[in-house]
From Swiss-Prot:
CDD domains: AdoMet_MTases. Substrate binds at residues 187-190. It comes from Moorella thermoacetica (strain ATCC 39073 / JCM 9320). Its EC number is 2.1.1.297. It comes from the Bacteria. InterPro entries: DNA_methylase_N6_adenine_CS, HemK-like, N5-glutamine_MTase, PrmC_N, RF_methyltr_PrmC, SAM-dependent_MTases_sf, Small_mtfrase_dom. The keyword DNA repair does not apply. Belongs to the protein N5-glutamine methyltransferase family. PrmC subfamily. This is Release factor glutamine methyltransferase. Methylates the class 1 translation termination release factors RF1/PrfA and RF2/PrfB on the glutamine residue of the universally conserved GGQ motif.
Length: 283
C-alpha cells in the first residue's frame, strides 16, 4: 500500500468516526507514524508504507476515530507559536487560551522585570509562553499533579526556560504564599459538573481535574479571586480564562471581593467571553 492509498483509507475511517477535519488529521498522523514533516510526506505519497510505520499509523487512526485526542496520539501541541509536549496527564492547550496570554503580553513591557504566577499550569503552556515573550520575567507555575509537573518540566527544558520558571506542587495558590506578584494568570476548571458527560469524547479524555468547575462551573473563581488579592502587588494584573457564558458572574464575584479595579471581560476569536482581567486596587 502506498502512502497515498493509506491516506485515502485513513480519511474514510476518520470521517466515519465523526472527525471534523479528516484529511488534515490523517496527514498529521501519517507524518507522525513515518517520522516525516507534512511537506515531506506530501512529496512522497507514491512510496510504500513501511510495515513498522503501518502498525503505528492504523492503531492511531482507529483510536482517533474512536474519539481519542489527536494531540495525545502525537504527543505535541502548538501554542503561542511554541511546541509543547502533551500527555493524558495534562489539559491540551487551546487557541482560546492564547487570548489570555496575549492580553497579559499587551499589558506588560517585555523590557521590564516581573514576578508572575500561573496557577494550575498543566503542560506549562501559559507559564512558559509568558517566560518566552517576557525575557526578564520570573515565573512561578503551580499544579497539584506530579505527572503534570513532569510534563511542564520537560517543556521548560526543551524551550530553554527552566532557569526562569519555577515549578511548584500544590493546589492553585498554596505554593505561592509569601510571594508578591506583578501578575497572576490561570486557566482554572470552569465546566459545570453536570455538563461533563455531554462533552465530546476527545474532551472527556482530558483530566477531569482540569475540567470540572463544580455545580455552576464557578468554584475555582470563588477561591482564586480572594486568594489572588493577597498575592498581587497594588496595581498587579489578574488574568483568568473563563467559560463562554461566565463573564458577568466572574465580574460579580470579583466586585464582591472588593480588592480589584478595572474589571473587564475580553472575547475569544469567536466573540465569546473568554478572559477576565482586573487590577489589584492600590492601598
Amino acid at each position: 500500500m502506498t502512502l497515498r492509498q493509506a491516506l485515502g483509507e485513513a480519511v474514510r475511517r476518520l470521517a466515519a468516526g465523526g472527525v471534523e477535519r479528516p484529511r488534515l488529521e490523517a496527514e498529521v498522523l501519517l507524518g507522525w507514524a513515518c517520522s516525516l514533516t507534512r511537506p515531506r510526506l506530501l512529496a512522497r505519497l507514491e512510496e510504500e508504507l513501511a510495515p513498522a510505520a503501518a502498525g503505528r499509523f492504523w492503531q492511531a487512526i482507529d483510536r482517533r476515530a474512536a474519539g481519542y485526542p489527536l494531540q495525545y496520539l502525537t504527543g505535541h501541541q502548538e501554542f503561542m507559536s511554541l511546541d509543547f509536549k502533551v500527555t493524558p496527564a495534562v489539559l491540551i492547550p487551546r487557541q482560546d487560551t492564547e487570548v489570555v496570554v496575549e492580553a497579559v503580553l499587551e499589558r506588560l513591557d517585555p523590557c521590564e522585570s516581573y514576578t508572575i504566577a500561573d496557577c494550575g499550569t498543566g503542560s506549562g503552556a501559559i507559564a512558559l509562553s509568558l517566560a518566552h515573550y517576557l525575557p526578564r520575567a520570573r515565573v512561578y507555575a503551580t499544579d497539584i499533579s506530579p505527572a503534570a509537573l513532569t510534563v511542564a518540566q520537560e517543556n521548560a527544558r526543551k524551550l530553554g526556560l527552566a532557569a526562569r520558571v519555577t515549578l511548584l506542587q500544590g493546589d492553585f495558590l498554596a505554593p505561592l504564599r509569601g510571594l508578591k506578584l506583578d501578575a497572576l494568570v490561570a486557566n482554572p476548571p470552569y465546566i459545570p459538573t453536570a455538563a461533563l458527560p455531554g462533552l465530546p469524547a476527545d474532551v472527556r479524555s482530558e483530566p477531569r481535574l482540569a475540567l470540572d468547575g463544580g455545580p455552576d462551573g464557578l468554584d475555582a473563581y470563588r477561591f482564586l479571586l480572594p486568594g489572588a488579592a493577597g498575592l498581587l502587588r497594588p496595581g498587579g494584573l489578574l488574568a483568568l480564562e473563563i467559560g463562554s457564558d461566565q463573564g458577568q458572574a466572574v465580574k460579580d464575584l470579583a466586585r464582591a471581593v472588593g480588592a480589584y479595579r478595572n474589571e473587564q471581560v475580553l472575547p475569544d476569536y469567536a466573540g465569546r467571553d473568554r478572559c477576565f482581567l482586573a487590577y489589584r486596587r492600590e492601598e
